[in-house]
Regions:
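Acidic-glycine-rich active-site phosphate/pyrophosphate-binding loop
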Residues: 46-49, 102-116, 156-169, 216-217, ...
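Phosphate/pyrophosphate-binding loops at sites that engage ATP/ADP/AMP, CoA/4′-phosphopantetheine
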Residues: 75-91, 243-260, 279, 308, ...
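Flexible, glycine-rich active-site loops centered on histidine and acidic residues
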Residues: 144-182
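Claisen-condensing/thiolase-fold acyl-transfer catalytic domains that form or cleave C-C bonds
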Residues: 73, 99-101, 110-113, 117-118, ...
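Buried hydrophobic positions in well-ordered alpha/beta secondary-structure cores of metabolic enzymes
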Residues: 7, 49, 79, 90-93, ...
Length: 341
């Protein structure tokens, strides 16, 4: 049984540098070593993907000394301040991001140390772009097992740096490397508590997880290489997403039209539109932020929810679905009801 869980309004952080499509293509052109006529189809293919995804700008961190943990701590500190919670009030801190600059210690320990949170439980959850929603499952487990744990913080700091390659020399390279050109950097954090928060929050009413592990090799970010994604094959697996969302809705006792806000992972605008159409969701319920931030990995759905909240469009009693499809191939989701203070 799911323990009582309330998700705070999130806080997010972006690098100061926005990079548009023309700048990204200029970087690829600079690295290109082929003939001029060989460049034309490569550029056309990249622009086609950008148009299909509705990629326009992504924010890329230029400070090479900023660690993912420090980046996450920026969003975490803002989240604590916004919700009037002291770092010393935290009982559990989970880092759910992909980016990390060390195998040990846990990046969560760095975030906690930078915040001055102690003593507490800290751990990392790694589940590709599904990490932050999967972290909710972990928090639910801790809440169920440990009565003394009352307040958790979940965070991520996604920085790509040299994990994205601009060394694209052929159409074959485009096929596996172009997804990396849509990636942006962002940090995000939110609180999970047993009791309602003074500033309001989302009461979690259900969660799901499914991994189709036979597809594990389609998308990888190796420890000693750059991000590669067989995007055509990966997006084809999107047919498995609507059934998982329906399973979540059935658990919550909702219909697709009952949901006021779908805050999904944002690999492309077209993929989100396709899922929402298949579900029969209200058109205005979809949140689209890929054009604003790019694909920011684990933090994408958080930026989408934050964007909708800052628009003042979330009201008491609104039903919300959070979801991410990720490398693995993993599909995770959570259903929540927004409750004002």
């Amino acid at each position: 049984m799911l323990p009582p869980m309330y998700l705070s309004a999130p806080e997010t952080a972006l690098p100061g540098t926005g990079v548009d499509n023309d700048e990204v293509i200029a970087r690829v052109r600079k690295a290109f070593r082929g003939k001029a006529d060989e460049w034309i189809p490569i550029e056309q293919s990249i622009r086609y993907v950008f148009d299909r995804c509705n990629s326009k700008v992504r924010y890329l961190e230029t400070d090479t000394t900023l660690s993912p943990g420090e980046f996450a701590a920026q969003a975490a500190a803002a989240c604590l301040a916004a919700n009037g919670v002291a770092a010393t009030d935290l009982d559990l801190l989970v880092y759910g991001g992909i980016a990390r600059d060390a195998f040990e210690p846990a990046t969560a320990a760095e975030v906690a140390g930078r915040l001055g949170a102690r003593p507490l439980h800290v751990l990392d959850v790694t589940c590709a772009c599904a990490g932050l929603i999967e972290a909710l499952h972990v928090v639910a487990g801790y809440f169920a097992l440990h009565d003394e744990i009352r307040t958790a913080l979940v965070c991520a700091g996604e920085i790509t740096r040299d994990r994205v390659t601009y060394d694209i020399q052929s159409l074959e390279d485009v096929a596996v490397d172009v997804a990396g050109l849509t990636l942006g950097n962002a940090a995000a954090a939110f609180l999970v508590t047993r009791e309602p928060l003074p500033g309001g929050g989302a009461r979690i009413v259900g969660m799901t997880h499914k991994t189709l592990s036979e597809n594990w090799a389609l998308c990888r970010a190796p420890v000693d290489g750059h991000f590669e994604s067989k995007s055509k094959e990966l997006f084809a697996l999107g047919i498995h997403v609507p059934p998982e969302i329906r399973r979540l809705l059935d658990r919550a006792g909702w219909s697709a039209e009952d949901v006021a806000h779908y805050a999904f992972h944002q690999p492309s605008e077209a993929s989100v539109e396709k899922v929402l159409a298949e579900l029969g969701a209200r058109p205005q319920a979809g949140v689209f932020t890929h054009s604003l931030f790019g694909n920011t990995a684990t933090t994408s759905w958080v930026l989408a929810l934050d964007h909708r909240l800052k628009q003042g469009a979330v009201h008491n009693g609104d039903k919300i679905v959070l979801a991410s499809a990720a490398a693995g191939f993993t599909i995770v989701s959570a259903a929540a009801v927004w409750e004002d203070a």
